[in-house]
Amino acid sequence: MSERKEQGIYAAFDMGGTFIKASLMNDSGKTVKGTFGIFPACSDQAAERILNRITEILLHMLADCPDGALKGIGFSFPGPFDYENGISYIKGLNKYDALYGINIREEIAGRVDERAKAFRKACSFKILFENDASLFALGECCKNKELQNTSVLCLTLGTGVGSAFLREGRLLKEDKDIPRNGWIYCCSYKGRRVEDYLSRRGVIELARERHISIREPAALYGMAVQGNETARRIWGEFGKQAGEILSPFMERFGGKDLVLGGQIAKAAVFFLDELEKTAGNRYRVHVAAGQEDESVFQGIYRLLAQEG
């Protein structure tokens, strides 16, 4: 008997602007063999086309599943988005604009239900939505037992800075000791937003101050790998600055662990020492290992399982 016939099943979708990554997960949070796929997103097309595309992918993955096996569908969706109610407010980004104001939960449930009726199958499952930073954080806690019974701030450092606060493996959104929704990007630091520092443009600006012109942090990382001392000092400055920005959040929250992910975290070998020096012994710093996609899918599973 196949894996998907033995256990309950969760469907996970990572809704990128260019591609949709999707997979089935079993009751243990493992990817069901042969179900992971990468599909064109059609994100610049009409709402009907996008919604039908999601439904087609889901039904294709579920083709061999028995009636009632599907326990939930989870989506990692970019914002702005009403994650609780499943409504997209993306506009002007040339991706998923056509879904603006649409209740995606209701639309997907209706399409799957209609198809199920045609095959006389019963449907009873939940559909949940969350942003990629929160799901990445949940996934990291799921993978690392050390993080499951503590207070964690998890960051994704890239074009912007995504953040999520967790306590004992659960996401916090409304808590007196954290920013609203757990989002630090819009908080103030030295008269500017945190995202102006802990992001692609923050690294580029630090490099420019040292008279190095780069278009991407990866270029500065490459220079540091090759032994360029100025590049290494810039990364050190980034780490020190990150520690100064993040330590007040950690202190107020009572955070014990800081997890770093995203493209910029790949350069952590050059900035981790300075970050840890600034942090002192107040909290531990971890750099996420493995593929970020894997953590997002693990996070979707964890979100659905917690809501079970």
Where are these regions (language model features)?
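Glycine/GP-enriched mid-protein hinge/lid loop-to-helix segment characteristic of carbohydrate kinases
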Residues: 23-25, 34-36, 46-47, 99, ...
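Conserved glycine-rich phosphate/nucleotide-binding loop
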Residues: 2, 16, 281-308
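Short glycine-rich anion-binding loops that position phosphate/pyrophosphate groups of nucleotides
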Residues: 78-81, 158-162, 264
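Short glycine-rich, Thr/Ser-proximal phosphate-binding strand/loop in the N-terminal lobe
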Residues: 5-56, 60, 68, 87-92, ...
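Conserved A3 ("GATE") glycine/threonine-rich loop of ANL adenylate-forming enzymes
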Residues: 18-19, 135, 159-162
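Adenine-nucleotide phosphate-binding core of ATP-dependent small-molecule kinases
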Residues: 42-66, 192-196, 204-270, 285-296
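Glycine-rich phosphate-binding loop and adjoining helix at the ATP-binding site
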Residues: 41-48, 52, 69, 81-151, ...
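Short glycine-aspartate micro-motif
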Residues: 10-14, 70-74, 152-156, 259, ...
